[in-house]
């Protein structure tokens, strides 16, 4: 029941993900951070098999650090996305990773950007996206409510609406979520959402209209 959400706003990008580590019917932990800070201005939200997810995101992170160490300059977000896509495509023909990625970053020359890369190395630059079962509900909400000029508060509010809809619609919904942001100030954690009560009785009027 993994859920990863990404949104690009006005000179920033937001990536959110659930924090549940689940296998079959068991919940192993509820504080698993699935949004990795790759470097000072890049975030990678990932879903998929836990072992593949952890190994692949750490592999990308260490290679970015190695490139910067050797060349004294960081990779751009676009270059990082192409490198990530290339590694998934190469592994697909050998020992594939079952990992889906939303890569967000900020570059001084182009601003914030978000890239969609799935486990078969499909690659797109997008403004909004989601992976996991939650994407069935988030994508319709974002189609209705998303605007390219959103402020940070508006983007986080949209993410919160997506989370509420996920918790309303999924039979077994994640309880905890983490939200991170990247902008000219860098990549950092913005907020956490923890729900210990029962799922909401109804979504917001906008969410209910879209999901109906």
Swiss-Prot record:
List, alphabetically, the Pfam families matched. Answer: Proteasome
Where does the chain cross the membrane?
none
Transport among keywords:
no
Q: Which GO terms describe its biological process?
A: proteasome-mediated ubiquitin-dependent protein catabolic process
Keyword Nucleotide-binding part of the UniProt annotation: no
**What InterPro entries does the database record attribute to this sequence?**
Ntn_hydrolases_N, Proteasome_alpha, Proteasome_beta2, Proteasome_bsu_CS, Proteasome_sua/b, Proteasome_suB-type
Alphabetized, the UniProt keywords read: Cytoplasm, Nucleus, Proteasome
Pull one GO CC term from this UniProt entry: proteasome core complex, beta-subunit complex
> Where in or outside the cell is it found?
Cytoplasm; Nucleus
Check the record and name the Gene3D superfamilies matching this protein.
Glutamine Phosphoribosylpyrophosphate, subunit 1, domain 1 (3.60.20.10)
Give the PANTHER family listed for this entry.
Answer: PROTEASOME SUBUNIT ALPHA/BETA
State the oligomer form and interacting partners: The 26S proteasome consists of a 20S proteasome core and two 19S regulatory subunits. The 20S proteasome core is composed of 28 subunits that are arranged in four stacked rings, resulting in a barrel-shaped structure. The two end rings are each formed by seven alpha subunits, and the two central rings are each formed by seven beta subunits. The catalytic chamber with the active sites is on the inside of the barrel.
The record's family statement is: Belongs to the peptidase T1B family.
User: What is this protein's function per UniProt?
Assistant: Non-catalytic component of the proteasome, a multicatalytic proteinase complex which is characterized by its ability to cleave peptides with Arg, Phe, Tyr, Leu, and Glu adjacent to the leaving group at neutral or slightly basic pH. The proteasome has an ATP-dependent proteolytic activity.
**Protein name from the UniProt record:** Proteasome subunit beta type-2
Which species is listed as the source?
Answer: Oryza sativa subsp. japonica (Rice)
Q: Which gene encodes it?
A: PBD1
């Amino acid at each position: 029941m993994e859920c990863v959400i990404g949104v690009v706003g006005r000179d920033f990008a937001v990536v959110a993900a659930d924090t549940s580590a689940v296998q079959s019917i068991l919940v192993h932990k509820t504080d698993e951070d699935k949004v990795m800070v790759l470097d000072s201005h890049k975030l990678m939200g990932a879903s998929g098999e836990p072992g593949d997810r952890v190994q692949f995101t750490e592999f990308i992170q260490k290679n970015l650090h190695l490139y910067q160490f050797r060349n004294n300059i960081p990779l751009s977000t676009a270059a990082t996305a192409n490198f990530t896509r290339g590694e998934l495509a190469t592994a697909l023909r050998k020992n594939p990773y079952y990992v889906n990625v939303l890569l967000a970053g900020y570059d001084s020359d182009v601003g914030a950007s978000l890239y969609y890369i799935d486990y078969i190395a499909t690659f797109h630059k997008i403004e909004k996206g989601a992976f996991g079962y939650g994407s069935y509900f988030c994508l319709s909400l974002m189609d209705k409510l998303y605007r390219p000029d959103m402020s940070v508060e508006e983007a986080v509010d949209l993410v919160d609406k997506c989370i509420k809809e996920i918790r309303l619609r999924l039979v077994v919904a994640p309880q905890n979520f983490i939200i991170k942001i990247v902008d000219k100030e860098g990549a950092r954690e913005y907020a956490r959402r923890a729900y210990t009560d029962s799922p909401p009785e109804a979504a917001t009027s906008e969410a209910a209209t879209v999901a109906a």
